Structure formats: structure tokens, C-alpha cells
Regions:
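Switch/coupling segment of Walker-type NTPase motor domains
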Residues: 77
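C-terminal regulatory/interaction module of P-loop NTP-utilizing enzymes
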Residues: 1-69, 81-111, 116-132, 136-318
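Residue-level recognition of beta-strand->loop/alpha-helix junctions
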Residues: 72-74
């Protein structure tokens, strides 16, 4: 049984090149397509998994491979001044200007908020416009392209310590903030990796940096140019599928916002485009739709994620 099957996703067709494996991350091949889709659309991504599962490593490698200015913030420790620098009044005292520090966000092209589920609520509110609007203090961040975050699974209200690791300091995000992440990706743990993936992980030998840089940039560009073609191809089918899926989730007490309905449509088109780039014509639309529901529901980031059975049942009925 593959890692993808254990996590509820259909196994991907064989690809000539795996993004995550080239970056030195094993066992994430089933996440290649949503990662590529997010990079091509510059959509925010939330990675959810236990400590030590390569969440931070992957993001740092992506930033390096794409040659982007990456700002890595530990959201559990951050202060607002760490983002914006030092505020000083301008002459006359009517306006503030920000004196940048080496870690401030102003020239960032890729922002990563680690441990976002341990962040104080007031700072989560300040991260909200960065993630959703690419703004801070009301000012547009012109260079910013990618906004990613990572967290440990939130601790359920009632838990059994014998069931595994519980992260008592990790709390569910505010629903409005969670709803701003088009892709919410659970990452595999050690026991979900196949033996060969485990062996490769122990050695961890990523591809040559220059090879990855050229290949990844090319894949992102081709995926971005393929998305409009997919949108045109799915124009008549997609609205009915998304409306049916959202209604079925509502019946299952998994309520989705109108914004999320639009996000699901956009995510499906970009994810199918990514799978066409990675796997060619073998990438079936049926599987792309299934993956969209598995990897683009905000409830995946809550204390009690929806069951695989529920999500796949909605997909089949829609």
C-alpha cells in the first residue's frame, strides 16, 4: 500500500520527475501536484504534521530552488516589530515610517509562518492580511508572492495519550484565517512512509541545486500557462460539481463558505493542470477532483478533521 493510499489520496501515476524527491524530501510524491499548483497560482499553503516531518526543510528548499528571498518567522515567538521593523514618526508627526531590519518583511518574496497554531490571537490577526491580501499595516507588499505556514495537529478537546503524540500547545486556527489557505496539506509521518522512502530519507541526497532550480521553474511556468486551458475545458462541468460537493458537505455538517466554493473550483483547475504537467495525459480528471477535496478543505486543519470516508463519499455523489 502506498503512502498516498494510506492518507486517502489516489496513487499518482509514475512521473519522470518528482518535485519533492528532487528537493530531498521522501514520501511526499503524492503532494507534488498540490505543491506545484500552489506555486503556479501563488496560493497560500498550510502544512500540517508532527515535528520532524520536513515541513520547514521543504519550504527552505523551495525558496532556495526558485531563488526567492525567504523570510522564516516562528509565529509562536514573533512580535509585530519583527515583521515591519521599527516604526518612527515622520517630520510633522502625522505619519509613521518603518525602519527595516534584516528580518523585516518588506522585500520578502516568500514568507513562511512556522508554528502558526501557537501564535497569539492578536498576532494571528496581523498575519491575516499578509496571507490573504499581501499587505502589512495597510501597505501592499509588492515583492511578495508565496505565503506558506506550518503547524502541528491541534490537540482535540478530549484526547487519549495512548493514541500517539498530542500537541497541547497547538490550537485550531481562527476559522476565518484557516479559510484563507486554498491548500491544507497533511504531511506523512514515519509510519506512513514505505521502507524505500525511509531508507532514502536516512541518506537524504537532494538533486543538484542548479538542476532543481531550472526544472522547478520550468514546471511552475508550464503549469501556470496550462491552467487557463483547463479552466476552459472544465467550464461546463465544474460549477455543477462544486455546487453539488458543497451542498453534500453541508448535509454532512461540514459547512463551507462561498469563498471556499470559489477556491475549490480554482484549486481543482490548478491541481489538474499540475497533474497534467507532472504525469501527462494519464492524469485523470476524476482523481484530480478527488485530490482537491482531500487537500483543499479548511476542516482538515481543525481538531477533528473530516474522515476519508466522508470526503470520498461526497466526491462520488457529486
Amino acid at each position: 500500500m502506498t503512502t498516498a493510499h494510506r492518507q486517502g489520496a489516489p496513487p499518482p501515476p509514475e512521473a519522470a520527475w518528482s518535485i519533492t524527491e528532487a528537493l530531498g524530501v521522501q514520501g511526499w510524491r503524492h503532494l507534488d501536484a498540490p505543491i506545484l499548483a500552489a506555486l503556479a497560482t501563488e496560493a497560500p499553503v498550510l502544512l500540517i504534521g508532527p515535528h520532524g516531518t520536513a515541513k520547514t526543510y521543504l519550504i527552505e528548499r523551495i525558496g532556495e530552488a526558485l531563488g526567492l528571498i525567504l523570510r522564516h518567522y516562528n509565529a509562536s515567538l514573533i512580535n509585530y516589530d519583527d515583521l515591519v521593523g521599527i516604526p518612527l514618526p515622520e517630520a510633522g508627526g502625522e505619519r509613521l515610517r518603518f525602519v527595516s531590519t534584516p528580518g523585516s518583511i518588506w522585500d520578502a518574496e516568500f514568507v513562511f509562518f512556522d508554528e502558526i497554531s501557537r501564535c497569539r490571537p492578536d498576532l494571528q490577526n496581523k498575519m491575516f492580511p499578509v496571507i490573504h491580501e499581501r499587505r502589512v499595516a495597510g501597505i501592499r507588499l509588492e515583492a511578495l508572492r508565496h505565503r506558506w505556514a506550518a503547524m502541528n495537529p491541534p490537540a482535540p478537546e478530549h484526547y487519549d495519550a495512548s493514541q500517539g503524540e498530542i500537541y497541547l500547545g497547538s490550537e485550531s486556527l481562527d476559522p476565518a484565517l484557516l479559510d484563507r489557505f486554498p491548500f491544507i496539506l497533511p504531511v506523512p509521518t514515519w509510519r506512513e512512509l514505505e521502507r524505500e522512502d525511509r531508507r532514502q530519507l536516512v541518506m537524504r541526497r537532494p538533486a543538484e541545486a542548479e538542476d532543481v532550480r531550472v526544472q522547478l521553474a520550468e514546471y511552475v511556468e508550464v503549469c501556470a500557462s496550462t491552467i487557463p486551458e483547463v479552466e476552459a475545458m472544465l467550464e461546463s462541468w465544474l460549477p455543477d460539481y462544486i455546487v453539488s460537493a458543497v451542498d453534500l458537505f453541508e448535509s454532512a455538517k461540514l459547512r463551507l463558505s462561498p469563498r471556499r466554493a470559489h477556491m475549490l473550483a480554482r484549486a481543482l483547475c490548478s491541481l489538474h493542470a499540475a497533474r497534467l504537467v507532472l504525469y501527462g495525459p494519464e492524469a485523470a480528471l476524476e482523481e484530480s477532483a478527488e485530490l482537491t477535496l482531500l487537500f483543499a478543505l479548511p476542516q482538515t486543519g481543525t481538531e477533528v478533521p473530516p474522515s476519508r470516508t466522508t470526503v470520498l463519499g461526497v466526491h462520488r455523489q457529486a
